[in-house]
Swiss-Prot record:
Protein species of origin: Mycobacterium sp. (strain MCS)
EC number: 6.2.1.20, 6.2.1.47
Gene encoding the protein: mbtM
Protein name per UniProt: Medium/long-chain-fatty-acid--[acyl-carrier-protein] ligase MbtM
Catalytic activity: a long-chain fatty acid + holo-[ACP] + ATP = a long-chain fatty acyl-[ACP] + AMP + diphosphate; a medium-chain fatty acid + holo-[ACP] + ATP = a medium-chain fatty acyl-[ACP] + AMP + diphosphate
Keywords: ATP-binding, Ligase, Nucleotide-binding
Amino acid sequence: MASALADAMTSSGRDLVVLDHGGWRRHPWAEVHQRAENIAARITEDAATVVVLVGEPTVEFIAAIPGTLYAGAALSILPGPVRGADLGQWARNTMQRCASIGVRLVFSHGEHLDALRATPASIPTCDVTETGHARRDSSFTPPDHGEFAVLQGTAGSTGIPRTAQLSPEAVLANLRGLVACIDITPADTGCSWLPLYHDMGLAFLLTNALGGAELWQAPTTAFSASPFSWLQWMTESTATLTAAPNMAYGLIGKYGSRLTDFDLGALRFALNGGEPVDCQGYRRFATEMARFGLDPSALVPAYGLAESSCAVTVPILGSGLQVDEVQVSSDDGRFIRTHAVVGEPIPGMQVRIAPTDGSGEQVDGRDFGEIEVRGTSLMSGYLGEPPLEAGSWFPTGDLGYFVDSGLVVCGRAKELITVAGRNIFPAEVERVAAQVQGVREGAVVAVGTDESAVRPGLVIAAEFRGTDEPAARTELVQRVASECGVVPSNVVFLEPGALPRTSSGKLRRLEVKRSMEDVNR
């Protein structure tokens, strides 16, 4: 894997373009490679076998990714502090996390570096900027690669976060599969603000590097501060490739009618992954962006997971958003569920649907079950747990089914809501609830409470910033009852930012469920 990246970067005539201190700065991939070798030399000198990166995506920070791989060490990228967090406590927690996964060297920069160095931890912590610019007396000779290339944290949205151990062969197979499916060439330009500690952000960066494309990389904090800047970045870069979670497309689509003066005519690949795809919101994004030249065939709803290095399925290039509609019966009539088709397995991967113990539904001829995967991109196992057997099927915990055009993912098995014997996927309720004025986009959780609760059934918790809670609550109940065929037993409005999330921004539905059950006992 290291040699493949080195060859791609040294032979590329394109650039890495980084948003740094408010301005875009160009760095040829060959320069990034040179800085990566400087960092690799330091890792080799320290004989570090596991390296952690923490910080904003500067050119040196990004160079440390291939640099770690060049040194044959295992890479783990950890998130910085969330807004409003205590910096000292974050630093202590981060160093404890480093110790738990066997880290031997930490690279960071700026205030993050200062905070990490102020902890009592004994793990060496280096300035990635200084190391990237260090002069070497001799050329770097890469050692043999280690057993693992990446230690990727899982989201932990339905349980305790774990660490997936990914071999160099698995990561490279996934990257090559993506390059083939997307047909990345040096003529392409990628644009991303995804966090590099998330598997989707890391894979997007590395696929562009491996494919010889130009990449414009912005910090996630820059998107969070000004989401519509994403459109400006794609316009400035003449981006052909981008990727984002569903909430970003939903946000842009919701307020798209207010926007002017963008050019998305070059965009041919806009991947939607990392969370359930809201077909209505994704379509609205395409409709609103059409006047800026967006071709709807660029929409790419995909499926992946950290345990499979990143991607599992991707639709055929240019097919756009394809949906499957399922008619569901309830006591109040028949309702239609709409799910995105997330395509076929990438090269080297296989997917099957395994029967479940009553957690799926047999509707309209679809065989619902748990999605299981295996293949060349699959992890070796979780850190601290027994390794996976070679060639074994890995149960993802996701429910879905197949149609002629590919896989359909319905939701997490642990998050399935059962009301009066009927199974409901949280995403369909959350999509409807988010349409109520004052309810924050991407800040709604639907859960089911058990029979021991005072008000068992469907409970909706939503961050609310409107002025008329009673009217909004009434509208929400009516909308959900009309469109989903179930009446919520309770609706709870919360302050913005109150819902618990993972480090990658995913809502922790099971934590909300426990809180709602505790309150209602």
